[in-house]
């Protein structure tokens, strides 16, 4: 079926170029970060864990690059890696919350980081609608194939049975793609917002670094936020390279296994390997140097699964067309559809699990963020916080799984206490 929509879909991470161009000189961060690691044991521990986890994800992605594709197992490894890193950032920020509150600039940095999660709510709602449409298409196919397989011969002649089955298969084909304009518009919006936020993070980090070089908490929090973001985009770039440029992904995987010191030096080494492999494709290198928030990886992994699902839907539609040509070809065509339906069902389920992980991550972070912002504002309810709470409630209210989850109950409790505090 292909892309029948007018919206251009994101295919790679080169959209980060504009943000990268705003900050041309990125050489200061690794050295500054290494000095902070030497002075702060906790940051050094984080550095070691980050490198180990990111290296494992890069190796998993690069293991299948010869076929220019990603296994679901490697996607799970990458997503798990980036979710773990993001949760560690949340922990460090909350541990240092009082010091963060005392520094307005540092507080703004952390606030920008957390508010980036809010932009994904509309996208997740659009994804949920698309998954429901995909499951409806799956049900149409399943019923058509079941009737053909189980209906007694006496109930209808073979030709009538085939005609009935083909009618239902045409119904599936007429339904079109489950991923509509709304879905791709939401994807593009969130992707652009995340990349814009990355530029703000980097500019603010540099400004504050000049003013607060001697402040230990700032160096710890800003270093962890930046390096986590940096590692996230590095892994994202390997995911993109696994499909578009397998030799690049292989070179990165080889470089990831080299013992070169701290994560700062390790990532710098990977960047050099990447630059050599691309033979001067500075656009991609610049995009990698920007660093990014975890949501970009969430979106990129979902995009890969969506595109994979669209290929399967298109393939099944081709099987339907083949079955329409000749009644004798119907049986073979239906057998082909059965095989593809199994892959289709698995892809829908995997995509649903990916979306659930995103939702649960947000359910876990937002209650903590509510208290963090509320306390920092002296128990005052800001307009953005109020909008965030309403948006979150709208999402949760539509999904029975959220209503019964401890994440949702925690958020309800958090919201109630916030309302009481500002009443």
UniProtKB/Swiss-Prot annotation:
Q: Name one GO cellular component term.
A: membrane
Q: Report how it sits in the membrane.
A: Multi-pass membrane protein
Q: Does the keyword Transcription regulation apply?
A: no
Family annotation (Pfam families): DUF677
Entry keywords, A to Z: Membrane, Transmembrane, Transmembrane helix
Query: What domain of life is recorded for the organism?
Result: Eukaryota
Family per similarity comment: Belongs to the UPF0496 family.
Native species of this protein? Oryza sativa subsp. japonica (Rice)
Basic residues biased stretches: 1-14
Localization recorded for this chain is:
Membrane
Sequence intervals crossing the membrane: 224-244, 247-267
What are the boundaries of the region Disordered?
Answer: 1-37
Q: What is this protein called?
A: Putative UPF0496 protein 5
